[in-house]
């Protein structure tokens, strides 16, 4: 099946991004050299559903060099980079993704990916797993198992497992030390504020920042906001994490109270409807609402 992307002519820019990543990922390169020499995944089909940008694209290319037939699609319509998708197609991978896909297009891309009947899946957010357990059980015939990248997807997996419905083994990559201690805390913590500041052109110093959720992503976001000079307020439903936030030097209160005083609100819970209409009614005019969770459902629009 042919790839479905926005424009193959964008590939040059995508190659440049992936090449830059290549030079800055020595650990993956070392693993990739071994996998390539052994042809570890020869004859295997791997479906990769991730935030499709240069770093994840390079992972897909490493798997491709290790002999796999790699099928790539995005795990969020708002994060796919069209030039990176084009570069992967030029390098011989199959891609079904473009930026700004509608819900219908997004799930069509996922279904086209699963039409390849994977041996292994790499999921980010749990949508591949959800389809395999609902409408696409036919695509499980070769499936050995897979990995899940993020908190949202791991929560969905735990739900299936608790109900006794999980039909194949999944590795919770999000629960590894290197993921949550470094990527979640430091990576998300920094990139969240980079995105907010570039988008709004606001300084953070002196602002009252409300961080919803004090998991590892929330910890990183709060830490970086404090470093930028903000007064940080944390909202958290888990009493242990709430106490941890207090011990880390942050003020803790319910969202109903925080809504009245915050200037910038950032949700990082992996849950839905964290900020709702009753909260927005009590907010000051001109506040900034931002979501750094996987899906765009934490702020009820």
Where are these regions (language model features)?
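Glycine/serine-rich phosphate-binding loop and adjoining beta1-alpha1 elements at the start
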Residues: 1-41, 72-80, 85-207
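Short glycine-rich or small-residue beta-strand-to-loop segments that form or flank ligand, phosphate
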Residues: 44-49, 71-73, 210
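Glycine-rich phosphate/diphosphate-binding loop of Rossmann-like nucleotide-binding domains
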Residues: 50-67, 183, 187-261, 267-272
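A short helix->loop->beta-strand "cap" motif at the edges of active sites that frequently abuts
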Residues: 67-69, 93, 139-142, 229-230, ...
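Short internal beta-strands
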Residues: 68-80, 233-236, 292
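Rossmann-like NAD(P)-binding element
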Residues: 115-126, 250-298
